[in-house]
Amino acid sequence: MYLQLLKSLNRVHPRAWDFIQLSRMDRPIGIYLLLWPTLTAVWIAGLGSPTLANVLIFGLGVVLMRAAGCCINDFADRKVDGHVKRTADRPLASGRVKPREALALFGILVAVSFLLVLCTNSKTVWLSFGAVALAFCYPFMKRYTYYPQVVLGAAYSWGIPMAFTAAGGELPASAWLLYIANLLWTVGYDTYYAMVDRDDDLKIGVKSTAILFGESDRMIILTLQMLSLGCLLLAGSRFELGGWFHLGLLGAALCFAWEYWSTRKLDRESCFKAFLHNHWAGLLVFMGVVLDYALR
């Protein structure tokens, strides 16, 4: 239904589908992975009763900035995507979209996102510049460091401190526990994603944590996931979250255990499924927070 709706936009403009694919709107998994931890922070910052304005601002902001990040990512990778089986048909790599068009769409999406942030307060506006900088820098990191997933984690977690400043103008130290938890989680699931392309990346000289971790990849991912849950548990104590939140963490832990088991053969398909599966862990943590506040 969702994809059919997007494809129907081709009736409005014959190239609409090219730009939908460029911004990955046809693949919402990235939206989910960014949305759940951001909304978790919005709920905690709002003490379980966030304003509708903040929910809409951060919800729409997630969609727009994730799309912007995909545009600049494909711009940065336009010369290497054609050499990777999974990405060879992307709009820029295949020539369906020009580099300047990708940059233009990136600029438009960032500008609209900034208009949303202007509806908050000055602290949140200033923090938003960090979000744009991280989104822009991430795609280029894989050329220079084996830790591009850490930069992605920093970018995907930036909405967390913004959610707190938007809610009350203050940024408590405990909010950074949520930030660190999400950064660790992101490095873990994006390493699964990088494992899908590891053989191709080795041939073309692209760096990633999947290459860095080598044969220890799955164990390191599981360790990162457990550390993430530990940070969430500590943050939950600071924010006085109880049983439902802990149940959400247990559900996430079971998700992580399944991912570790399911990738034991290290084939591309199972690694990609493990990456996709992570959004359920994020959703369970978010639902645990929502229910913990709602059922007090």
Swiss-Prot record:
A Pfam cross-reference name: UbiA
Listed GO CC annotations: plasma membrane
Cell location: Cell inner membrane
Keywords: Cell inner membrane, Cell membrane, Magnesium, Membrane, Transferase, Transmembrane, Transmembrane helix, Ubiquinone biosynthesis
The keyword Iron-sulfur is annotated on this UniProt entry: no
Signal sequence bounds: none
Domain of life the protein comes from: Bacteria
Record-level Gene Ontology MF annotations: 4-hydroxybenzoate polyprenyltransferase activity
UniProt-listed InterPro entries: HB_polyprenyltransferase-like, Prenyltransferase, UbiA_prenyltransferase, UbiA_sf
Catalytic activity: all-trans-octaprenyl diphosphate + 4-hydroxybenzoate = 4-hydroxy-3-(all-trans-octaprenyl)benzoate + diphosphate
Cofactor(s) it depends on: Mg(2+)
Pathway(s) this gene product operates in, as recorded in its UniProt entry: Cofactor biosynthesis; ubiquinone biosynthesis
Record's bilayer topology term: Multi-pass membrane protein
Listed transmembrane segments: 28-48, 52-72, 102-122, 145-167, 174-196, 219-239, 241-261, 275-295
Protein name: 4-hydroxybenzoate octaprenyltransferase
Organism: Pseudomonas putida (strain W619)
Taxonomic lineage: Bacteria, Pseudomonadati, Pseudomonadota, Gammaproteobacteria, Pseudomonadales
